Amino acid sequence: MAWTGDHMTEIHELGVAESAKKIREGSLSSVELAEALLTRIKAHSELKAWVYLDRDAVLAAAQTCDAAHRKGEGKGALHGVPVALKDIYCTAGIPTTACSKVYANHVPNEDATSVVRLKAAGAI
């Protein structure tokens, strides 16, 4: 839980800006945030909201971000913040099907421009 001024907020309820701020300040780690979000996803798996989710890759990226942050090497405004991408944005090495049988086995070799920009800002 995190203090947001007038009440306690569950970590998974934090917005992107607040999450990024807390990571920059050191009051929240990328791993803590990623674990909270992954726990929430698992708790509601019956929704089947995720076409593809690589938990190990998310946690490894969060650990890398935390290590960089400790060295003062934050990457950008979204450093260490996990983001979800709709299954229509090409992401290199990750199945991107657009929920279509036509693209059932599509694994792009490069990222969409929006994904490139998110990664450049430090998003996981």
Language model region names:
Residues 55-78, 85, 104-109, 118:
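Flexible, acidic active-site loops/lids enriched in D/E/S/T/G that coordinate Mg2+ and/or position polar
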Residues 44-48, 91-101:
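Cytochrome P450 core scaffold surrounding the K-helix E-X-X-R motif
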Residues 75-97:
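Conserved small-residue hinge/capping positions at short loops/turns
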Residues 113-124:
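A glycine-rich phosphate/pyrophosphate-binding beta-strand-loop-alpha-helix module
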Residues 19-25, 84, 103-107:
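Short, well-ordered beta-strand elements within core beta-sheets of diverse protein domains
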